[in-house]
Amino acid sequence: MKIVLTGATGMIGSVLTERLSKSHNSLVLLSRRPPAGNHAAKRQWLAWQPGVSGEWERAIDGADAVINLAGEPIAGKRWTAKQKEILRSSRVDGTKALVHAIAKAKVKPKLMISSSAVGYYGPHGDEALNEDSKPGDDFLARLCVDWETEAHKAEAFGVRVCLLRTGIVLAKGEGALKKMVPPFKMFTGGPLGSGRQWMPWIHLDD
């Protein structure tokens, strides 16, 4: 299979790249800053700037699947107005650019897997939720709604769209745990808030 992947340098994308490479897959990895000198077999790195035409658009033509994991880290910086715009544009504009490239492709991918998050639902306390539950109305919820809306537009071109509403992704020494574990190692850790609030999570292996 020929798979086009965005977000390949992120925590999820880097692991997925390694696992897909072990199968008989040809990978095209899109990045704003492709690593220099990375010429591993079955992998092709291409510079990707949403809204700017380039070789990356032609790579989508004839691909079997597009996996869209790109997005500025949610917890990387304080949510100033500027940072919120970066969070939004890295997700919504990036997805819009991919769908635009799919629309132009002569041979369109059969599948597009696009990231989202459980932030889609907003805070609900103890209420059980599923994929049919209504979205929330805070910043993260509105961001996820707009993000998913752009991905769904690929369906107009006969592409099956799957959305991944993941929780906090946990992995040893990476992501959220990388920031949460050190205080406990220094015996200064403790519960966050009341310690009774819900925190949906998923392990990186899953």
Give the location of each predicted region.
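SDR active-site strand-loop-helix element
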Residues: 6, 30, 69-70, 112-118, ...
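N-terminal Rossmann NAD(P)H-binding glycine-rich loop of SDR-like oxidoreductase domains
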Residues: 3-23
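Conserved Rossmann-fold NAD(P)-dependent oxidoreductase catalytic core, especially the SDR/UDP-sugar
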Residues: 84, 96-138
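N-terminal Rossmann-fold cofactor-binding loop
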Residues: 30-34, 49-50
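A conserved structural motif in NAD(P)-dependent oxidoreductases
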Residues: 200-206
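NAD(P)-dependent short-chain dehydrogenase/reductase
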Residues: 141, 154-157, 162-163, 167-200
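NAD(P)H-binding glycine-rich loop region in Rossmannoid oxidoreductase-like domains
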Residues: 43-94
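Catalytic helix-loop patch of NAD(P)-dependent Rossmann-fold dehydrogenases
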Residues: 89, 93, 125-163
